[in-house]
């Protein structure tokens, strides 16, 4: 394949879980959806550098990655997301241009406030499997089972 359709983007997201077992989610300003903080990697940064940058930009928090918990491909947009379970290591929640709001949610609340394709990222981060989940979705719904 040639042209723009042949290219993929890589994104990263951090599922920040606090000492009470709650997950930080942000409400995106661009679409109003709740999801884990994250975004597209820049070409010249490592995966971990991008993760730390994106979480800090969208929340004000400094985090420590604990584990890669999932790899997700948006089949419609060609975006591959690497999602990490993280713990807070500093900083403070800060208003910014990307997040309209913040919430600390329980694992059980994820499906109620976000599309399946994004809720599953939260749920997968709570699993204690040695292997990360590998899933495909259409931007809203899963289209393949977990591995």
Task: Label the predicted regions.
Residues 123-147:
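Charged phosphate-binding loop/patch that engages nucleotide di/tri-phosphates or the phosphate backbone
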Residues 1-23, 40:
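Conserved N-terminal beta-strand and adjoining loop/helix that marks the start
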Residues 68-74:
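Short, solvent-exposed loop/turn elements at beta->coil junctions and helix N-caps
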Residues 41-64, 75-125, 147:
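Unchanged
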Residues 7-9, 18, 28, 76-79, ...:
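A generic fold-level signal
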Residues 18, 22-57:
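Conserved Nudix-box catalytic region and its N-terminal flanking loop in Nudix hydrolases
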């Amino acid at each position: 394949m040639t042209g723009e359709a042949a290219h993929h983007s890589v994104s990263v997201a951090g599922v920040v879980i606090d000492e009470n077992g709650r997950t930080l989610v942000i409400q995106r300003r661009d679409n109003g959806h709740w999801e884990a903080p994250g975004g597209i990697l820049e070409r010249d940064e490592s995966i971990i550098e991008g993760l730390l940058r994106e979480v800090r930009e969208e929340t004000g928090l400094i985090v420590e990655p604990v584990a890669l918990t999932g790899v997700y491909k948006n089949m419609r947009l060609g975006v591959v997301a690497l999602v990490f379970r993280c713990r807070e290591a500093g900083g403070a929640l800060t208003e910014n241009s990307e997040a309209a709001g913040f919430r600390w949610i329980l694992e059980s609340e994820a499906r109620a406030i976000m599309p399946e394709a994004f809720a599953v990222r939260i749920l997968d981060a709570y699993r204690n499997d040695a292997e990360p989940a590998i899933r495909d979705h259409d931007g809203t719904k899963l289209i393949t089972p977990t591995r």
